[in-house]
From Swiss-Prot:
Homodimer. Interacts with DAPK3. Component of the precatalytic, catalytic and postcatalytic spliceosome complexes. Part of a spliceosomal 'core' complex consisting of CDC5L, PLRG1, SPF27, CCAP1, CCAP3 and CCAP6. Interacts with PLRG1, Lodestar/TTF2, and NIPP1/PPP1R8. Component of the minor spliceosome, which splices U12-type introns. Within this complex, interacts with SCNM1. Component of the PRP19-CDC5L splicing complex composed of a core complex comprising a homotetramer of PRPF19, CDC5L, PLRG1 and BCAS2, and at least three less stably associated proteins CTNNBL1, CWC15 and HSPA8. Residues 108-143, 246-278, 409-459 are annotated as: Disordered. InterPro entries: CDC5L/Cef1 (IPR047242), Cdc5p/Cef1_C (IPR021786), Homeodomain-like_sf (IPR009057), Myb_dom (IPR017930), SANT/Myb (IPR001005), SANT_CDC5L_II (IPR047240). Residues 142-245, 676-701, 764-802 form a coiled coil. This is Cell division cycle 5-like protein. GO terms for molecular function: DNA-binding transcription activator activity, RNA polymerase II-specific; DNA-binding transcription factor activity, RNA polymerase II-specific; identical protein binding; RNA binding; RNA polymerase II transcription regulatory region sequence-specific DNA binding; WD40-repeat domain binding. One of its GO terms (biological process) is mRNA splicing, via spliceosome. There is a cross-link at residues 135, 219, 487 (Glycyl lysine isopeptide (Lys-Gly) (interchain with G-Cter in SUMO2)). It comes from Bos taurus (Bovine).
Amino acid sequence: MPRIMIKGGVWRNTEDEILKAAVMKYGKNQWSRIASLLHRKSAKQCKARWYEWLDPSIKKTEWSREEEEKLLHLAKLMPTQWRTIAPIIGRTAAQCLEHYEFLLDKAAQRDNEEETTDDPRKLKPGEIDPNPETKPARPDPIDMDEDELEMLSEARARLANTQGKKAKRKAREKQLEEARRLAALQKRRELRAAGIEIQKKRKKKRGVDYNAEIPFEKKPALGFYDTSEENYQTLDADFRKLRQQDLDGELRSEKEGRDRKKDKQHLKRKKESDLPSAILQTSGVSEFTKKRSKLVLPAPQISDAELQEVVKVGQASEIARQTAEESGITNSASSTLLSEYNVTNNSIALRTPRTPASQDRILQEAQNLMALTNVDTPLKGGLNTPLHESDFSGVTPQRQVVQTPNTVLSTPFRTPSHGSEGLTPRSGTTPKPVINSTPGRTPLRDKLNINPEDGMADYSDPSYVKQMERESREHLRLGLLGLPAPKNDFEIVLPENAEKELEEREIDDTYIEDAADVDARKQAIRDAERVKEMKRMHKAVQKDLPRPSEVNETILRPLNVEPPLTDLQKSEELIKKEMITMLHYDLLHHPYEPSGNKKGKTVGFGTNNAEHIAYLEHNPYEKFSKEELKKAQDVLVQEMEVVKQGMSHGELSSEAYNQVWEECYSQVLYLPGQSRYTRANLASKKDRIESLEKRLEINRGHMTTEAKRAAKMEKKMKILLGGYQSRAMGLMKQLNDLWDQIEQAYLELRTFEELKKHEDSAIPRRLECLKEDVQRQQEREKELQHRYADLLLEKETLKAKF
């Protein structure tokens, strides 16, 4: 009898590796081909193994408390729908079902008071795992069976074969074609060398014959060209860098060896300098050192300034009360206004409200699900199954947020209202004489009625509320009438220790300033210094205006010329010299960085620093104070006014200024090839074309930037106004529909009106016709009646005869 092979069983490590490699090669659709590599597994088992265990997206970590609560909640809402529950939790369906049964068994053990540390779902000796695809793989034995070795070698050979029969045949045909072409080429060359010319028969190819033609060939125009600018650099080949090890690069083994050597040297130096830390590092003790976690404190609910204000108010009221007692004022109004609120109940201040006891929600939900699973049929009757408090408000369970009670913000002498009992039971309180009310505290002194007793008030009754308002108004009126006459004999006296406190605050050095405040103050000082330094710079640097990359020193005139320079020319030369010095200084200390340079590198600057330094050594740059710069600016303003009055210059309008600016700007031309500006009348046609191309490119860049900005703004406005647009379109559609309905109704109205006119004119004619028909019918009926009577009489006569 042949041996029957039943596929399945525990998965081994070898089978897992073969399955992963096969999925990488064949994909996740050809499970039959993948299963042909594994002799003991079917295609369905391979697919289940991949989607239940080997898929890298499967989460195999410990279940968190939130996931367990969500699992039990969803199992309560959607029983047995594990394929629907699994993606919500982020686990597989088998994991959800297994952990759900684990929680139920754990709850059952707790109900039976059988606390065991073992997993209740663990297989017992002799049991067979019904779902081996969801369990870890069994390690491979050292001496594997021949069947497993044969399966492994076959899978290795099949998976290593990345080229099938068709690919090998194509490669062989391509190689034969290349050999045939080379042989024909050699034959034609030999015949041509022997003086025999053979015309090659070309087959018409659809594409380009790259063996006979030059693709994208552009033949130069006929004529002579100047080749003086075509300077070719001679190839200086360095044959020492053409060795095999230089071409291959550094080997990985050499790099690892060098790194190991560096680590040994570093460890040796560390042992020589810091022996204890090196011993800890080598012994591995440092792995067990636990880093202390950061202390997280809640934000203060009352600031220091508010506490100081409270203290000041308390001191002022205490001083006023003591002054009133010393002066002998004992009337009821003053005693009420100056009531003492300092003494607090220490037992209340020392009591900490307790937080509500937390409950094991997971255990409660598991017990509820077990109870619902084991419910008898409702046909038997009886009481419902007792359940814990459950939640059906949403897909995810509600989380109970535990908050620390705030004892700071409560009023010290607050009389508890109805239902305002705290979490901790209070001692020394008298219960209220109200039925079904929470016992409240004994009311403390409250002469100003700040905290009225509202435990017995029924604010839902409007008549009661109006009665309370009338009583409070009357009580206030009587109190105001009973006030004594005012006396303007008050004087303001500062406390004796106020000045001492101010001095102690100034002298107190024990206060440690916060590091963030220190950094902020230092940053503010640095910003102020930077602003000051910026104000001392030149206007071109302050406004980040374009500055020349090279200084043109040829603008200076020679001093020994004939005829000699005039005083005005000498002054102009001094101004030019100072300008050149300023340019050298700015190029050295504040090089210009164009805004279009996104990499943050200076283009064309920094290479002539030695030249700038040498010039500044011979012509030192002189720094001026703020006052000197202000005086120079005033002198320039005065000179401008003198020139303006002397040359009769008036106020230019914006149109005239723009016209002059456009005329001046049109005379200047930028040469991108030479990176400089020149006059437009001195430039050649080629330079003008290049300048216009550069300007066109810049304008296109601006246009692209503005288009992106406009698209971004359009997208933003679409997000902001999309609802309004859709609403407007809907209203327009409704308006059009209503207009169509109005037109249709108007047409129907006109139609029925015309129909009514025709009916009104046709009704009399119809009535006449009907009347005539009725009259004819009546006459016909009379004639027939007479004939009937005659025939009846004739019948009777004939009967009488016979």
